[in-house]
Every structure is written in C-alpha cells, then in structure tokens.
Amino acid sequence: MAKLVLVRHGKSEWNKQNRFTGWVDVDLAPEGIEEAKKAGQKLKEAGFCFDICFSSYLKRAIKTGIIILEELDLLFIDHLKDWRFNERHYGALTGLNKDEVKAEVGEEKFLLYRRSYDVPPPPLSEDDKRHPRFDPHYKNFPVELLPNTESLKDNQIRAMAAFHERVAPLLVEGKDVLITAHGNTIRGMVKELDGISDEDIPKFEIATGIPRVYEFDEALHIKNVYNID
C-alpha cells in the first residue's frame, strides 16, 4: 500500500513576525528547524522509508524536506522541486503584518482574504517589486504563469495539477512519497483528497511540522488518513 505524507514546513521567521509570507523566500526560524527534526524523528519511529521527496521552490519547505530526510538517513533519494507546491500568493498583502491589515480593512474582509476558499486578496501591480516576475527563482518562467494574487482555490488547482502529473503515477507504482510544502498548499490538497466542502475548509488548520499520512491502494483509492503528532 503506497503512502503519501504531507508536511507543512517548520515555523519561519515571518511566521514569528505574523506577516503574510506567500512566495517570499523566508528562511526557517530556529523553532522551525526543531519542528522539522521532530517530524523526521516521528516518521522514523513509525517506520517510514520514502522513495522520493517533493518540495516547493521556497527554502523553508526545501530545508524542511532535507532535515526530515537526514533524520531518516534518506538524503540519497531524489528530492525534486516544483513551483506549483509554492505557498498561496497573497498579492498586495505580501509582507504586511496580519494584525495591521485586520485593523485597516476590518475583521470581515480580513477573514475573507485570509481564510475563504475562492476570494483572493487585492493583486500586486506588475511593476511592484514584490511581483514574482522580479524574483530570480522564476526568471525563466513565462510571465503569464506567475500570479499577482491567489485564492485558496487557485493554490489548490496548481498544487493538485502537480500531484496528478508527478505524484499520483508514483503512488500507483507503490512508491512512498513525501511532500514538504506550505499551510495553504496542503490545505488545498487536503480539501480535494478528503472531500472537504468549500464552507468547511476555512476552519481546517494545518499545523507546522505535523506529518499527515495518506495510504492508497493500487487503484489510488484512499484507505486510511491520519496525522503523526
């Protein structure tokens, strides 16, 4: 039975500062490094041995993957990066303090931007230096691929496209796959995998550093789902 394990990266420096991070390549905080180590240790204790790891293009997810693989003594396996596993793009909210945004726009609009399924925050202008087209990570990407804002639904669509294209075929082959990514990215994936409604997904939380395990049969039907915490 093939296993898929989703892990949200450990706490980042901007998580600590309560800022909207999105595609900004913020590093892990010391606490986040420890969270990643503990995730790897828990997976080792539970007997996991992965065939391949995927991460986003962002260092907080990449480093989380590396730390987990090191704890499992699996640094030799393929560790592939796919931008479609990036965090949701927060548009004009990128880099702003969440409490300050809430005070400015009001709680109702703040929750709509932050937690709703299909409402994106205000977009970045194309000449805003926070736009991904100015980021060297994406210098070879067609500009039309790069978002200036995203809803959770947008995030889910691109992440699940990567899942169906790259991950699902490996699970069908019986491979065990680790994905280290981001809170909204994983929330969107869980929504589709678990069949969570648009109304219920805003209340669903993804904790940092807690592995979420899916067990699949040969037909890619989910047979079991659980967290290792």
Swiss-Prot record:
GO biological process, one term: glycolytic process
Positions annotated to bind substrate: 8-15, 21-22, 60, 87-90, 98, 114-115, 183-184
Pfam hit, one: His_Phos_1
Alphabetically ordered keywords of this record: Gluconeogenesis, Glycolysis, Isomerase
SUPFAM superfamilies in the record: Phosphoglycerate mutase-like
EC number: 5.4.2.11
Positions of the catalytic residues: H9 (tele-phosphohistidine intermediate), E87 (proton donor/acceptor)
Pathway listed: Carbohydrate degradation; glycolysis; pyruvate from D-glyceraldehyde 3-phosphate: step 3/5
Catalyzed reaction equations: (2R)-2-phosphoglycerate = (2R)-3-phosphoglycerate
UniProt cross-references to InterPro entries, sorted A to Z: His_Pase_superF_clade-1, His_PPase_superfam, Phosphogly_mut1
Site (Transition state stabilizer): H182
Highest taxon of source: Bacteria
CDD domains named among the record's database cross-references: HP_PGM_like
GO MF assignments: phosphoglycerate mutase activity
Subunit description: Homodimer.
Family: Belongs to the phosphoglycerate mutase family. BPG-dependent PGAM subfamily.
NCBIfam families noted in UniProt: pgm_1 (TIGR01258), PRK14115.1 (NF010713)
Function field: Catalyzes the interconversion of 2-phosphoglycerate and 3-phosphoglycerate.
Protein name, as recorded: 2,3-bisphosphoglycerate-dependent phosphoglycerate mutase
Organism expressing this protein natively: Nautilia profundicola (strain ATCC BAA-1463 / DSM 18972 / AmH)
